[in-house]
From Swiss-Prot:
Subunit structure: Homodimer.
Pathway linked to the protein: Cofactor biosynthesis; biotin biosynthesis; biotin from 7,8-diaminononanoate: step 2/2
The reaction(s) this protein catalyses: (4R,5S)-dethiobiotin + (sulfur carrier)-SH + 2 reduced [2Fe-2S]-[ferredoxin] + 2 S-adenosyl-L-methionine = (sulfur carrier)-H + biotin + 2 5'-deoxyadenosine + 2 L-methionine + 2 oxidized [2Fe-2S]-[ferredoxin]
Entry keyword set: 2Fe-2S, 4Fe-4S, Biotin biosynthesis, Iron, Iron-sulfur, Metal-binding, S-adenosyl-L-methionine, Transferase
Protein's name according to its UniProt entry: Biotin synthase
KW Metal-binding (keyword) present: yes
Length: 334
């Protein structure tokens, strides 16, 4: 068992005081904290977030431009065409994307992310994405992000020129655990796309899914590997086992473990936006979600996710209002 006072005191001086994230061995200590120390961890993580990121919460909506039929075998994902999943391939048109962006903006969101279930975009998808970004920017006061898989240098340039300001490509899990989650591509391929995105001047968004069977050591490894990306945003998902996938029978992550992970990720990345994403409703519930927002989280996806239901948007907005958490206002470009 870790020396609780020692590791939290170290984090208080190193992270809160100096803005330097914890290393892997220190994060392992955080992830092994006893349950009774979770409130102290959450309070410290909240202080770190307020000092280094500010008090605002960024709200985002996401939509799937192309759902299902993906050729990859990510074991957690019901959009893979390789598994006996109920999800079937569906494409949205430009008008539907614009309308979804308008509805997202009405919630107070400043970010709208267009997602496609593909290994990487072909010319048809790239053209449609460019058209969608242009249409949304004409009609909606919102930033547009994208997540359409692995990219070539030419595709990265096209998206940056189209006005995509942030690109999501999740590392998903620790490098050492990745082969147990995906076999049709490598962790290094994902990392290379993120390098290209950063070089093109787009903001890097990369996170993953916790509770897939990784060890605490691998969870700490993952946090450090994400920190090395210097990402603008890290979305944290918790496994929501999907019928028909290889991980369908995996148990849900314990809520206490999820809170420890949130605290650890904040202490690893004091300057990074850390976003609540899929699975929080099942893993944490309403009370745990509130603890997370007061324990290091400073961004949230509202509404539904790609293939799973989220909480009603109004419930999340009411929760943030009750907790007196101000929403980020979209910065105007003049």
């Amino acid at each position: 068992m870790p020396n609780t006072t020692s590791i939290l005191d170290t984090a208080r001086h190193q992270v809160l005081g100096d803005g330097i994230g914890l290393d892997q061995s220190q994060l392992i200590e955080i992830l092994n904290l006893p349950d009774e120390d979770i409130p102290a961890l959450m309070e410290l993580a909240h202080q770190v977030r307020l000092k280094w990121c500010g008090e605002e919460i960024e709200v985002e909506g996401i939509i799937s431009l192309k759902t299902g039929g993906c050729p990859e075998d990510c074991h957690f994902c019901s959009q893979s065409g390789l598994f006996e999943s109920p999800v079937r391939s569906v494409w949205l048109d430009i008008e539907q994307l614009v309308e979804a962006a308008k509805q997202t903006a009405k919630s107070g969101a400043t970010e709208f992310c267009i997602v496609a279930a593909v290994k990487g975009p072909d010319d048809k998808l790239m053209n449609q994405l460019e058209e969608a970004v242009a249409a949304i920017q004409r009609e909606v006061d919102i930033e547009v992000a994208a997540s359409v898989g692995s990219l070539t240098p030419e595709q990265v340039t096209r998206l940056a020129r189209a006005g995509v300001h942030r690109y999501n490509h999740n590392l998903e899990t620790a490098r050492s655990f990745f082969p147990q989650v995906v076999t049709t591509h490598t962790w290094e391929e994902r990392r290379e796309t993120l390098r290209l995105v950063a070089e093109a001047g787009m903001e890097v968004c990369s996170g993953g899914i916790l509770g897939m069977g990784e060890t605490l050591e691998q969870r700490a490894e993952f946090a450090v590997q994400l920190a090395e990306l210097n990402p603008t945003e890290v979305p944290i998902n918790f496994l929501d086992p999907r019928p028909g996938t290889p991980f369908a029978d995996r148990p849900l992550m314990e809520s206490e473990d999820a809170l420890r992970a949130i605290g650890a990720f904040r202490l690893a990345m004091p300057h990074t936006m850390i976003r609540f994403a899929g699975g929080r409703e099942l893993t944490l519930g309403a009370e745990g979600s509130e603890q997370g927002l007061l324990g290091g989280i400073n961004a949230i996806i509202v509404g539904n996710y790609l293939t799973t239901l989220g909480r009603p948007m109004e419930d999340d907005l009411e929760m943030m209002d009750r907790l007196q958490l101000p929403l980020k206002v979209l910065n105007k470009v003049i």
